A protein has these predicted regions:
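Non-catalytic, surface beta->alpha helical segment in thiol-disulfide oxidoreductase systems
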Residues: 263-285
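Typically the conserved alpha-helix immediately C-terminal to a functionally engaged Cys/Sec
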Residues: 204-218
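Non-globular targeting/processing and membrane-anchoring segments
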Residues: 33-186
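N-terminal export signals
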Residues: 7-23
């Protein structure tokens, strides 16, 4: 499967607006103090399309004022979900997440029991909301919660497998290249597998996402075998790496938490250290 850089970027949909605002892990969370007075905002989708199946759906969103993503927002966003007939099927609520990222986000989570097209509405939004699609599992090409994660021989320190550089995190490669994904899955240990390119990410979230996972790696040690695969095979970002095609991905970053070869949790596009630690702790519980 061949995916061009343009196709990879396009797969993230409206996530391109985020890139222009330059999320950077070195920024302080102090720049994103909640502003409870924000109203009339547009919902900026920070989730991929065509990847959701019935069950628990995570919808990370940011908020914007016309064309500008806001660096402040309410401490909590509340709202509801409508089905294709505009019937309300769920209420939702999510706290702001802004630890060491410039643009805060709210990870909305809702349980959807059947495929369909839905609309997320939030109190104080501009009246339009944000659409999302839940598909029959047979129509989803990427691994999802409950499906197996296929093994793949990802680049390691000892064998880059044609990916140069094998890790674009700076100032030095991340420590998550000691074993391949195949070896990690075969070990029987819980596995965390992240695909993302810190150097060429178009959403501005890949470098902080990987840095947060490295910190989690230091915290939990060998309780989880962690593996990273970069997105491009070359430093010019002209050729998509085989690891991306192996999963059928058209967006990044993505983190899979896996037990006994089965995906237990999948986190898409954006997370901060707080949310990541919460999800890893739940994964290990």
């Amino acid at each position: 499967m061949s995916i061009s850089r343009r196709h990879l970027i396009a797969g993230a949909g409206t996530l391109l607006v985020v890139a222009a605002c330059g999320d950077n892990s070195k920024s302080s969370s102090q720049s994103t103090e909640p502003d409870p007075g924000t109203t009339g905002f547009t919902i900026a989708q920070r989730y991929p399309s065509n990847t959701f199946v019935p069950g628990k759906v995570r919808l990370p969103i940011s908020i914007s004022n016309k064309q500008t993503l806001l660096t402040t927002g309410p401490a909590v966003l509340n709202g509801y979900v409508l089905d294709s007939t505009d019937k309300q099927i769920a209420t939702v609520s999510a706290p702001i997440h802004s630890t060491d990222i410039v643009i805060p986000y709210w990870p909305i989570v809702v349980n959807i029991d059947q495929p369909g097209t839905f609309t997320l509405r939030l109190d104080g939004d501009d009246g339009f909301g944000a659409a999302f699609l839940v598909s029959d599992p047979s129509q989803v090409t990427v691994p999802y919660v409950g499906s197996p994660l296929p093994p793949f021989d990802t680049p390691t320190v000892d064998n880059h497998r044609g990916v140069e550089p094998y890790c674009t995190l700076t100032p030095k490669p991340c420590p998550l290249h000691e074993v391949t994904l195949t070896q990690a899955l075969g070990s029987g240990a819980p596995v965390a597998y992240i695909v993302g390119t810190p150097a060429h990410c178009q959403t501005g979230t890949c470098a902080p996402a990987l840095e947060f996972l490295v910190k989690s790696h230091s915290r939990v040690g060998d309780k989880i075998t962690m593996v990273h695969a970069d997105v491009y095979s070359d430093d010019a970002a002209t050729t998509v790496a085989p690891a991306v095609a192996a999963l059928g991905l058209d967006y990044e970053p993505v983190l899979y938490l896996v037990k006994h070869g089965t995906v237990v949790d999948r986190v898409d596009v954006i997370w901060d250290q707080q949310e990541l630690d919460e999800r890893i702790d739940a994964f290990l519980a």
